């Protein structure tokens, strides 16, 4: 009887503890693939999970997840979006060449696929994402209006798909995915001044203060979103570095003063420790080669307080 109680207690720990990772099995076959490996990029993790492809393109992989999340299945330049959750078993048949060309609907799931993955397939096959030439040719006012229209259209793609299918789904994941697909558009704001000057040098319009619509649309300083949304870290680190750079664009003091003021600006943002640390690390790495011994000592000292 005592052993039965112990077994039940262990089972309860696994079921009740959300941090206990559970296995997800993915197997299938690739055609027109590159090399002899397939990779899984799990949102929020720095390392990849890899699986070997045999001579016929077959593979089998076991992932460990503690909750439903976004996973990219990758081979060469082909990448396919998946929603995977603890306990799932998935079989997939994929032509890597077609995926590289954006034919996401060509993927076959012999044993069925979840609504979340179908939502992403629908989105990526129908999303509105302008070319560089189309995106940066517009004046600041036109650019802002265009981005606002694109966001509305793309959000509609997701919401309409979810409403049209009455089956259940992970609402939290869908909400995070709606943030995820905005990140590439949000990043375009960082490149707008340079690309616009190249593509439309005649336009001398001033950039208004409320130019960046993603200042309000995308949450900032939220550890959960920062860690869970695919490539959100890259966006937010760039966002805060750009914000500080703009505040210091007219600074004319000595390098040592600049780095001290930079860290003062970072502290004034009151960011979560992880985010502040990542922002500082990015800034330091970008300027590492130009640092004098005096500046290095300042950076070493100020970094301890981040």
Give each language-model segment a name:
Residues 179-193, 274-289:
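Short, hydrophobic/amphipathic alpha-helical patches that form generic packing surfaces
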Residues 260, 276-306:
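N-proximal helix/coil linker or "cap" segments that precede and/or mark the start of modular domains
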Residues 16-176, 180, 188-192:
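A non-transmembrane, solvent-exposed segment enriched in polar/low-complexity residues
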């Amino acid at each position: 009887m005592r052993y039965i109680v112990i077994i039940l207690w262990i089972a309860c720990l696994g079921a009740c503890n959300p941090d206990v990772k559970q296995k997800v099995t993915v197997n299938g076959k690739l055609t027109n693939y590159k090399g002899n490996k397939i990779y899984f990029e799990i949102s929020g993790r720095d390392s990849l999970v890899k699986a070997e492809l045999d001579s016929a393109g077959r593979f089998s992989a076991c992932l460990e997840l503690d909750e439903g999340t976004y996973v990219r299945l990758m081979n060469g330049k082909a990448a396919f979006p998946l929603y995977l959750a603890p306990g799932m078993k998935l079989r997939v048949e994929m032509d890597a060449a077609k995926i590289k060309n954006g034919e996401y609907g060509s993927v076959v799931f012999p044993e069925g696929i979840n609504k979340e993955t179908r939502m992403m397939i629908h989105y990526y096959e129908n999303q509105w994402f302008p070319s560089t030439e189309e995106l940066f040719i517009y004046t600041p006012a036109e650019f802002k209006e265009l981005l606002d229209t694109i966001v509305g259209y793309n959000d509609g793609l997701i919401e309409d798909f979810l409403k049209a299918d009455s089956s259940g789904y992970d609402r939290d994941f869908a909400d995070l995915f709606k943030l995820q697909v905005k990140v590439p558009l949000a990043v375009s704001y960082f490149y707008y001044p340079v690309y616009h000057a190249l593509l439309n040098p005649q336009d001398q319009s001033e950039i208004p203060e409320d130019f960046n619509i993603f200042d309000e649309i995308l949450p900032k300083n939220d550890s959960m979103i920062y860690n869970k949304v695919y490539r959100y870290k890259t966006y937010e680190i760039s966002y805060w570095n750009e914000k500080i750079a703009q505040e210091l664009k007219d600074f004319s003091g000595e390098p040592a003063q600049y780095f001290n003021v930079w860290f003062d600006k970072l502290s004034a943002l009151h960011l979560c420790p992880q985010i502040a640390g990542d922002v500082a690390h990015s800034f330091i790495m970008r300027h590492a080669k130009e640092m004098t011994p005096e500046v290095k000592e300042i950076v070493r000292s100020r970094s301890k307080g981040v």
